[in-house]
């Protein structure tokens, strides 16, 4: 799998029924209005026959589903035209720890190494009435039918392509039921569906997996960008949130990246689009279970990003959701990577944002809630960070709306200045 793996939560009617009462209460306050998207990063993706690592002391759940494989570039596709953009389908296992909440991104539950086995692709005539069977050690443990999905494969492709351009090789996992099958070390989990090649993977203890790992993770064209929400206390206060006690991490899809001196589109009929100046840490070598004391040894350098957000699209599901943070071209990054030796103290750098030459935002990395070594140690505790992966460390207070015609410059002292211009949907066509 060379593309991005997108997945959707709360897309099976059994999930919606189980959570119906909770949806009317805080922190949700209302049922989800749109598809609840998340990303399975490249460290999660394994192939048929490769082992699923079982982290000690956790409960691990199998999530048999189907992956839609994109066949050609898709942007703003109507559901009735979706079939023309689908190369085929494959069985998938959206492995996860149990989820007790859908409010914040579930990176610790869903983004662990090997937590997304993907099978071989094949054409399929009717994905909307497909029985998916899970076998554990040769015995059926569960089955369900895609007719019970809230949104069909075509509807999901249409919904995602409305804000994110999909590329050949991208995958969309269609969802899982509320009840999942528990796994144990030593199990062999096999997923079956008529017309698709079977997907089978052994489950091994994580420490055994680390000792005997003989394959390399599938690499994508770019590294994964992990982003931090509310990592400056003044920014959390600005948004009326209590500073988090654990890092609030979400993942940015590659479609959202754009470069220095490029444009970002403000969607029509939105009320609030704001910038976020951020220091980005670039990982230089494979990091797994790294201590804070040694974490900086895994840093290659630093760059700058502007993590734009469209606040109109915020919902209280995996907040901040992909419609807010992963729209096409909404994350300028660059203009270069500065070697870590050129930055004497990354925890004492001034960040500034200028809009049309006016200073709108200023802060310092000295005010980070979670330091760079802590973040590397935190993430590498449950997933493998790979060379080229990036961590956007958050933004200080000072947000304001930007509109078409604005020139936005974000800078990080000693790292660089990143220039970007806001345009309307019409001028971007």
Regions found by a protein language model. Give the residues of each.
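Residues embedded in well-ordered beta-strands
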Residues: 65-69, 133, 278-282, 303, ...
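Short helix-loop capping/hinge motifs at secondary-structure junctions, enriched
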Residues: 74-77, 124-128, 287-291, 342-344
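Catalytic-pocket segment enriched in acidic/His residues
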Residues: 15, 96-220, 231, 235, ...
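Short, conserved beta-strand element in jelly-roll/cupin
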Residues: 38, 67-72, 158, 169, ...
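Extended, compositionally biased flexible segments
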Residues: 1-72, 198-277, 420
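Short helix/loop capping segments that flank catalytic or ligand/cofactor-binding pockets
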Residues: 15-17, 48, 77-79, 100, ...
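N-terminal accessory regions of nucleic-acid-interacting proteins
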Residues: 75-89, 288-302
């Amino acid at each position: 799998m060379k593309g991005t793996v997108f997945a959707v939560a709360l897309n099976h009617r059994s999930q919606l029924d189980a959570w119906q009462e909770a949806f009317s209460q805080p922190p949700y306050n209302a049922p989800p209005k749109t598809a609840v998207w998340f990303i399975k990063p490249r460290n999660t993706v394994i192939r048929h026959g490769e082992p699923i690592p079982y982290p000690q002391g956790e409960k691990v759940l199998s999530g048999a589903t189907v992956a839609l494989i994109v066949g050609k570039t898709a942007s703003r596709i109507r559901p009735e035209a979706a079939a023309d953009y689908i190369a085929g389908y494959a069985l998938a296992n959206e492995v996860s720890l149990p989820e007790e909440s859908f409010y914040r991104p579930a990176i610790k539950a869903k983004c662990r190494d090997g937590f997304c086995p993907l099978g071989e692709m094949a054409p399929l005539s009717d994905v909307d009435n497909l029985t998916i069977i899970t076998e554990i050690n040769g015995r059926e443990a569960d089955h369900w039918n895609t007719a019970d999905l809230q949104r069909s494969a075509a509807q999901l492709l249409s919904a995602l392509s409305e804000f994110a351009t999909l590329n050949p090789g991208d995958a969309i996992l269609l969802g899982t039921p509320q009840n999942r099958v528990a796994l144990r070390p030593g199990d062999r989990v096999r997923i079956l569906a008529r017309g698709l090649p079977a997907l089978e993977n052994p489950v091994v203890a994580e420490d055994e997996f680390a000792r005997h790992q003989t394959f390399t993770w599938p690499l994508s064209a770019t590294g994964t960008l992990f982003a931090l929400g509310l990592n400056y206390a003044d920014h959390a206060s600005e948004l009326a949130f209590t500073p988090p006690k654990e890092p609030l991490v979400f993942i940015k899809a590659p479609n959202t990246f754009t470069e220095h001196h490029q444009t970002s589109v403000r969607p029509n009929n939105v009320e609030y689009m704001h910038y976020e100046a951020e220091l980005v840490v670039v990982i230089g070598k494979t990091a797994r279970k790294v201590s804070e004391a040694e974490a900086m040894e895994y840093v290659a350098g630093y760059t700058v990003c502007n993590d734009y957000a469209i606040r109109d699209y915020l919902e209280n599901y995996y907040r901040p959701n992909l419609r807010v943070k992963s729209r096409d071209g909404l994350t300028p990054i660059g203009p270069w990577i500065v070697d870590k030796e050129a930055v004497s103290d990354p925890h004492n750098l001034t960040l500034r944002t200028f809009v049309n030459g006016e200073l709108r935002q200023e802060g310092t990395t000295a005010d980070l809630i979670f330091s760079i070594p802590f973040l590397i140690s935190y993430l590498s505790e449950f997933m493998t960070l790979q060379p080229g992966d990036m961590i956007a460390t958050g933004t200080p207070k000072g947000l304001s709306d930007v509109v078409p015609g604005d020139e936005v410059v974000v800078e990080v002292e000693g790292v660089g200045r990143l220039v970007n211009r806001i345009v309307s949907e019409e001028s971007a066509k």
